[in-house]
Regions:
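Non-catalytic interaction-recognition regions
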Residues: 1-184
Length: 184
C-alpha cells in the first residue's frame, strides 16, 4: 500500500521499497496476548530498559563520578542500545524471546557489552594521544598476531554490510560487531 501511495504522489523510488517483517517477539513468560493483558507497551519497555541500565550501571560502578545529567544520558544510551541490539542480533525471519534482564548485561552478546568495549577503546586512544603517540604514522608499528587478526576481521566489514543488505538481515552486522569486540 505504501509503495502505491508513494508512487501516486510522484515518488518513483516507492516501487523499490521492500516490506521488512519480523518474527514474533515473545517474553520469557510466554507469548504476548492482548486478550490476557500480556502485551508490553513499547514506551513502557523503553522506560524499563533505561531504568534497568541505570541500576546495573550503578551496581557495577560505571556511573561513579558522573553528574546526574551524565548518568541519565548514559542510562538512556545503554538501555535503548540494549533493546535495539537484542532485536537486531536475531535474524528478522525468526521468532525471538526478549529477556530484558539478559539484554542489559555488560557481558556476552549484548548491546551494553559492545558499548562498553567501544568506550574502553576510545579511552585507550584518548590516553595514547595524551601520552604523545601519533595516530597517523604507523610506519614503525609491527602488529602482533592478535592485532593482525583484528585488522583482518575489520577488513571483512564491507562484505558483511553488502551481504546484510542483499539478504535484508541486519543480524549479520550485529553479530559481526559482537565477534569483532570479542577479539579486542
Amino acid at each position: 500500500v505504501l509503495s502505491l501511495l508513494l508512487d501516486r504522489l510522484g515518488f518513483k523510488w516507492g516501487k523499490d521499497l521492500v516490506h521488512f517483517s519480523y518474527g514474533m517477539v515473545e517474553l520469557p513468560e510466554g507469548k504476548m496476548k492482548s486478550r490476557e493483558g500480556t502485551v508490553v507497551d513499547a514506551d513502557d519497555l523503553m522506560d524499563e530498559m533505561v531504568n534497568s541500565a541505570r541500576e546495573v550501571s550503578k551496581e557495577l560502578g560505571k556511573l561513579d563520578g558522573c553528574t546526574a545529567e551524565e548518568a541519565n544520558a548514559i542510562s538512556e544510551i545503554v538501555g535503548l542500545g540494549a533493546l535495539k541490539y537484542f532485536l537486531l542480533k536475531v535474524d528478522p525471519r525468526k521468532n525471538m524471546t526478549f529477556n530484558p534482564k539478559e539484554s542489559i548485561d555488560f557481558n556476552g552478546n549484548t548491546g551494553p557489552f559492545i558499548q562498553y568495549t567501544y568506550a574502553r577503546i576510545r579511552s585507550v586512544l584518548r590516553k595514547a594521544v595524551e601520552a604523545g603517540y601519533s595516530m597517523t604514522d604507523y610506519s614503525k608499528v609491527e602488529p602482533n598476531e592478535k592485532e593482525i587478526s583484528l585488522i583482518q576481521r575489520l577488513a571483512d566489514f564491507p562484505a558483511v554490510v553488502a551481504e546484510a543488505g542483499r539478504t535484508y538481515s541486519p543480524a549479520l552486522i550485529a553479530n559481526y560487531v559482537y565477534d569483532l569486540v570479542k577479539e579486542y
